[in-house]
């Protein structure tokens, strides 16, 4: 139902923005701002190389609690962040890692995807895309805040962090989409020399 006097006047006629529901406008605005305006990026400092894996706990898509510090205490752990499940860029990022799963496994890399979506959205996204890794539902934003990737509109900024034995060894501050796995593998090749 349109707001009287705001979106139903002569200027609103025919404009798709005016026809969006009241509940959709904030989501569309948030997606637009985080996509096209980098100054709406992070409100805090992102973790840097050398930082310890934050001791935060978050539920995965099935409601199972995951303690990140414990999960990443030994070996490689990739934690990647995306703004919204089932959106084009986020799907490309996850599918890149899915498609390189065998290569990542050979290198001993475990993967967690994180967004501020709820568990059911994460489960649907995981199932639709056949992701072989867990997706964390950071509804209370504890993980995004601990990693310094919560943007000014409260969503996770696209980024990725690779940990070795609980210490950050690589950061992709902008979070690649279709080539996320390639960038991780390229870094791992430099470590094996």
Predicted regions and their residues:
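A short beta-strand-turn-helix
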Residues: 57-76
């Amino acid at each position: 139902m349109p707001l009287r006097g705001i979106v139903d006047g002569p200027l609103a006629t025919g404009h798709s923005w005016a026809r969006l529901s009241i509940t959709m406008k904030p989501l569309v605005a948030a997606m637009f701002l985080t996509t096209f305006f980098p100054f709406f990026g992070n409100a805090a400092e992102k973790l840097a190389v050398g930082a310890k894996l934050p001791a935060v706990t978050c539920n995965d898509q099935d409601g199972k609690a995951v303690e990140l510090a414990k999960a990443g205490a030994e070996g490689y752990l990739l934690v990647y962040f995306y703004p919204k499940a089932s959106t084009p860029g986020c799907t490309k990022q996850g599918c890149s890692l899915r498609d390189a799963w065998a290569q990542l496994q050979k290198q001993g890399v475990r993967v967690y995807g994180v967004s501020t979506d709820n568990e059911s959205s994460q489960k649907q996204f995981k199932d639709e895309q056949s992701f072989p890794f867990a997706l964390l539902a950071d509804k209370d934003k504890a993980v995004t805040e601990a990693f310094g990737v919560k943007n000014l509109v409260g969503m996770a900024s696209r980024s990725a962090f690779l940990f070795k034995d609980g210490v950050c060894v690589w950061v992709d501050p902008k979070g690649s989409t279709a080539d996320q796995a390639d960038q991780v593998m390229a870094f791992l090749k430099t470590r094996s020399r």
